[in-house]
Amino acid sequence: MEIIMIFVSGILTAISVYLVLSKSLIRIVMGTTLLTHAANLFLITMGGLKHGTVPIYEANVKSYVDPIPQALILTAIVIAFATTAFFLVLAFRTYKELGTDNVESMKGVPEDD
């Protein structure tokens, strides 16, 4: 199961890199969001999927799952939500000001010689 999740995380990373390298601001935002999801999936997979039980004390349990990766992932999800919201607002304001979401057309004004 862990090998499958690592491959899925790699595929998500490849898709997100493709989206980040595109010319559209919305695709760049979606690529960064997908990259954070791929990193979260990789971290939760490395935390262990099938070893132990929930870290709540019970009498007859010999091993527990490490709760640190789960806590880090929850924090990363909240931070990713906030940065995605900020990027979406920034992309929307850029579109309203410039009339385009194409990064190539946002290069700036040529200098007067």
UniProtKB/Swiss-Prot annotation:
One of its GO terms (biological process) is sodium ion transport. Na(+) extrusion is completely inhibited by the H(+) conductor carbonyl cyanide m-chlorophenylhydrazone (CCCP). It is a multi-pass membrane protein. The keyword tRNA-binding does not apply. It holds the Pfam family Oxidored_q2. The keyword Methyltransferase does not apply. It is found in: Cell membrane. The chain crosses the membrane at residues 1-21, 28-48, 72-92. GO terms for molecular function: antiporter activity; monoatomic cation transmembrane transporter activity. GO terms for cellular component: plasma membrane. Keywords: Antiport, Cell membrane, Hydrogen ion transport, Ion transport, Membrane, Sodium, Sodium transport, Transmembrane, Transmembrane helix, Transport. May form a heterooligomeric complex that consists of seven subunits: mnhA1, mnhB1, mnhC1, mnhD1, mnhE1, mnhF1 and mnhG1. PANTHER family: ANTIPORTER SUBUNIT MNHC2-RELATED. Belongs to the CPA3 antiporters (TC 2.A.63) subunit C family. Mnh complex is a Na(+)Li(+)/H(+) antiporter involved in Na(+) and/or Li(+) excretion. Na(+)/H(+) antiport consumes a transmembrane electrical potential, and is thus inferred to be electrogenic. Does not transport K(+), Ca(2+) or Mg(2+). This is Na(+)/H(+) antiporter subunit C1.
